[in-house]
Amino acid sequence: MFKPSFTNLTPHSIWVTIHPDFLDDRGIEYPASGQVARVAANRAEGPLCGPHRMVQQSFGAVEGLPEPVEGTVYIVSALVLSALAGSRPDVVAPDTGPDAIRENGQIKAVRGFVC
C-alpha cells in the first residue's frame, strides 16, 4: 500500500480524525510546515455602496507551492486548491464540509481531504 508523506502548507495545524463520530487520540495531526501556499489577491477601489466603501478583488497565481515531489502530498487551503483547478494531483485541502468536527463554531478536526 502506498503511504504518502503529507506536508501542511497552511498556517495552522490540521487534525484528521480516524474515529467517525468524535475527536479522539486516533487521529493524525499535520503541523504547519512554516511554508504557506497562497493565492495572490489583486484589490482595487470599487464603487460606494451607500455609505460603505467597496473593494473589487480578483485572484491571481498560486504562490509558495513547491514543485511536485514523488510520494509527497501538499495540504493547502480550499482557495489554493480551487485556483489550481485540478492541475496538481499532489495537492489536497481539508474537507471542511458539514461532516467536519466543530467546537463553538470552530473546526477542530476534519474527516479527510478534498482533491
Where would I find each of the regions flagged by the language model?
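Intrinsically disordered, low-complexity segments enriched in small/polar residues
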Residues: M1-C115
